[in-house]
Amino acid sequence: MINISFPDGSVRQFENDITAYEVANAISMSLAKAAMVAEINGELKDLSTVIENDCKLRILTAKDSECLEIIRHDAAHIIAEAAKELFPDIQVTIGPAIENGFFYDFAKDKPFTPDDVAMIEARMHEIVKRNEQITRELWNRDKAIEFFKSIGEHYKAEIIASIPAGEQITLYRQGNFIDLCRGPHAPSTGFVKHFKLMKVAGAYWRGDSRNEMLQRIYGTAWATKEQLDNYLLMLEEAEKRDHRKLGKELDLFHFQEEAQGMVFWHDKGWSIYNTIEQYIRKKIRKNGYTEVKTPVLVDKSLWEASGHWEKFRDDMFALDTDDKTLALKPMNCPCHVQIFKQGIKSYRDLPLRMSEFGLCHRNEASGALHGLMRVRSLVQDDAHIFCTEEQITDETVSFCKLLTEVYKDFGFTNISVKFSDRPEVRAGSNGTWDKAENALKEAVEKAGFTYTLNPGEGAFYGPKLEFVLTDAIGRQWQCGTLQMDFVLPERLDASYIAASGEKKRPVMLHRAILGSLERFIGILIEEYAGCFPLWLAPIQVAIATITSDLNDYALEVQKALIDNGVRTDINISPDKINYKIREFYNQKIPMIAVIGKQEQENKQVTIRRLRTTEQEVLSLEQLITLIKEENEKYL
């Protein structure tokens, strides 16, 4: 007798071995028809899986979030089948589910054209209509290698050859197509109804630039038409907000081939950058941080001692000089430990909060670079808190409060937290990890956050919190982090004198709020769609004259504004006023001060605000006071 327990607490008994599908059918025919996969003792399995022993069982349908990845994985198999039917000479390689969709890499002599992609998408819909049964097959490894070689699929044969000898191979068959896969999959292709192919890109075989270039087709797939439509609308809006496009239109920054992954900041973009730095500097000073500056180029011996050389060597820029190897720092933490070690530290000196706008360099692959979001040269709003174990909770709560204030000032109120606990490969004892994880959990709960668990995703030296923002169009951005570190102080021999008189290692909290300033500015450009709030806008007020005989007064207004720290632009050309206003609106300047004869006579300006048709007449003093008060809230 087999006892099967269900999520509602009920238990059913079955006399003989039974498949998950048969269990679903025993509950109701409608459930069996909608069922996609089964969760057996916490693991996702095909519905054809035979249940031989007592277990816990969930039958999952498209309404369950876990099935979205199944739908996308099925879609990857369907695109491969469609492409093979239309282009029999191509080879299929790999095709996983990814965030928001799927992709498949193909080896094809000629590039896929837009017409080819449209044909593949149409054939995918045909395969879905066929509702082909998807079946799991176990194969002998050597037999599988020979089979794929015999049908000209040499990439698949190579993948299987890398699997240890003697292991069974899992293949999935649908119609005349068969693919290597661990699964699970839905019972048939008919479950994948709502998808769209998005683009074609190049991808190296096995992600290695020394290998041949393949063609990758990306797609998106969703459980419902409404979800698909909403996603496509979001992409359309995201395209309008693309920071690379707006960065060019608003004259903020540019990139060029001679300095890949390095930002050329223009005057307006650099204004935003400096304003953010000024804002953060004010915040951290109020919260008891000191600010330091450490070298950019450091001997590799420090990176070897810290463990970064072994772990991140391939991502570091290094050069040999005077029989030494120097490396551009990829992060600031080892340098901050060097400052901590200067002079004897007492428990009375802790917590010590050390911040730096640290210039770091990371050797990102050229294909991974993406505007401001992924660069090789970056500045982090980095800080390290050296504290005792007893201070961990209070310091974490204090950091969470500061982070919440900062995000709110930039307009982000929807913040979620991911808690990443111990990875399989880690430094430190289980007891140390228990203590660290419990302290972080207590602190994040005390700070008023709920969190989702990211099992095994902590750093090798300690658990971490990741703070995720949701933007105006529903996208999520991981920005802030707090990582606990018991290892680096040990490796770099940092210590303090405890109240007992003995030497102890401080705990090191690595923390950032914005992450890299470059990436955060990219996020802000897209969040605001280029319409920055008054305090942050590179040009706060633009002055436009109706006629040229008002130019002297306009210049007087500009000087008064500049003298009071207001960022301004002016157009006193003979162009028509409507043209001037339109040009300033296109530059998304928050306030336009229009000057006519009446304004000159009364020492006033007429203010037009971005995104509104309302006008407001202010004296010059009122305008200056209004902007200064807004600036002082943040700066």
Swiss-Prot record:
Catalyzes the attachment of threonine to tRNA(Thr) in a two-step reaction: L-threonine is first activated by ATP to form Thr-AMP and then transferred to the acceptor end of tRNA(Thr). Also edits incorrectly charged L-seryl-tRNA(Thr). SUPFAM superfamilies: Class II aaRS ABD-related (SSF52954), Class II aaRS and biotin synthetases (SSF55681), TGS-like (SSF81271), ThrRS/AlaRS common domain (SSF55186). Residues 242-533 are annotated as: Catalytic. Zn(2+) binds at residues 333, 384, 510. Its cofactor is Zn(2+). GO terms for molecular function: ATP binding; metal ion binding; threonine-tRNA ligase activity; tRNA binding. This is Threonine--tRNA ligase. Disulfide bonds: none annotated. Homodimer. Binds 1 zinc ion per subunit.
